[in-house]
């Protein structure tokens, strides 16, 4: 038992280190305004101009110039969203439909993170929890093989895909974490 607790602690420390590295390498892309705007639209219902202004203002304050430029001018549609609050507000339903993800972003925003960082923290937290769930699921599947569980969990967590999903401002990592949580709950209920 102590051996598996020690291995779990080492795994958590490695996961934490990886999360810190991912935070340093965060990305800002064209999905970010949609999720930031979705949180603000709930805070300022019907005030499209204010939502539009605050969305792009908050991103501009944090994103490097080249990434912000890519967000607002990558193509004609993005340019239109940046220049026209009505056009931007018409896109928000495509983002607001991911209710749990937007609620998680809002939770971190209310904790004091900026909106762009709230999106990132939601994904990084989801990444960390997904890594824990991978470990727990593998531990359930291979109960007597602690080193195998540790090794597989570490390899899966350190895959570039895992990092890419953690830093991208979209709900993919969040959805993966929720899926793993349900799968783990299923395994615990039906051994």
Language-model segments: residues:
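Juxtamembrane segments of multi-pass membrane glycosylation machinery
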Residues: 82-92, 96, 100-122
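Interfacial juxtamembrane loops and adjacent helix segments
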Residues: 44-97
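Membrane-water interface at transmembrane helix exits
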Residues: 105, 109, 135-143, 187
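Multi-pass, polyprenyl lipid-linked donor-dependent membrane glycosyltransferases
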Residues: 125-126, 140, 146, 150-154, ...
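Start-transfer (signal-anchor) and selected internal transmembrane alpha helices
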Residues: 1-19, 23, 27
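Membrane-helix interface segments
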Residues: 112-117, 141-150, 189-191
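Transmembrane-helix motifs of polytopic, lipid-linked glycan transferases
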Residues: 121-142
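Alpha-helical transmembrane signal-anchor/signal-peptide segments
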Residues: 25-39
């Amino acid at each position: 038992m102590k051996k598996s607790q020690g291995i779990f602690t080492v795994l958590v420390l490695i996961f934490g280190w990886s999360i810190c590295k991912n935070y340093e390498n965060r990305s800002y892309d064209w999905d970010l305004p949609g999720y930031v705007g979705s949180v603000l639209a709930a805070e300022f219902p019907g005030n499209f101009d204010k939502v539009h202004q605050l969305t792009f203002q908050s991103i501009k304050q944090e994103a490097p110039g080249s990434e912000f430029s890519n967000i607002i001018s990558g193509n004609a549609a993005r340019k239109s969203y940046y220049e026209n609050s009505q056009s931007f507000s018409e896109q928000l339903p495509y983002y607001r439909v991911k209710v749990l993800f937007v609620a998680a972003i809002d939770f971190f925003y209310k904790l004091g993170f900026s909106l762009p960082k709230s999106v990132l923290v939601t994904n990084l937290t989801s990444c960390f929890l997904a890594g824990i769930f991978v470990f727990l699921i593998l531990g359930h599947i291979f109960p007597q093989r602690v080193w195998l569980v540790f090794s597989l969990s570490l390899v899966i967590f350190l895959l570039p895909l895992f990092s890419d999903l953690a830093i991208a401002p979209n709900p993919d990592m969040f959805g993966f974490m929720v899926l793993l949580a349900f799968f783990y709950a299923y395994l615990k209920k039906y051994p």
